[in-house]
Amino acid sequence: MTVNQILNAKGKNVYSVGSTTTVYEALKIMGEKNIGAILIIDGSELKGILSERDYARKIVLKDKSSKETFVDEIMESTVFTVKLSDNLENCMELMSSKRIRHLPVLEDEIVVGIISISDVVKAIIELQKDTINHLNSYISQ
């Protein structure tokens, strides 16, 4: 299964903010959209990613104000990405080795989607269902 197939199943919605957005405003969007991370994009350039984990570690635990802190101060600027043609195994390997939960999807340096650990798990479950159905059909012949 490819990243493109996963995005076709889940949708290609991408939520982002600019680097001068406050953490509070970014969190507000994350809450409204029920997402665990938001991309930081200036123009069409991916600058970073802000996750709930970043907020907890860099705002809450350091007793900072989310209304007075900009996302570029706490975002993760080293962003690991995948392409539409990458496969599910590549996503799992990258998420596991880098200990991350979200992978922006780029095509020609433009963000076209984002894959979460939840999307990967759902894809694995679907693949297992297909395998079980195939085996059941084979056995019943």
What are these regions (language model features)?
Residues 6-40, 44-46, 54-62:
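N-terminal first-folded block
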Residues 16-34, 41, 81-99, 106, ...:
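The conserved cystathionine-beta-synthase
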Residues 30-33, 38-54, 95, 103-118:
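A glycine-centered beta-loop-beta connector
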Residues 1-12, 51-80, 87-96, 117-141:
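Tandem CBS (Bateman) regulatory domains
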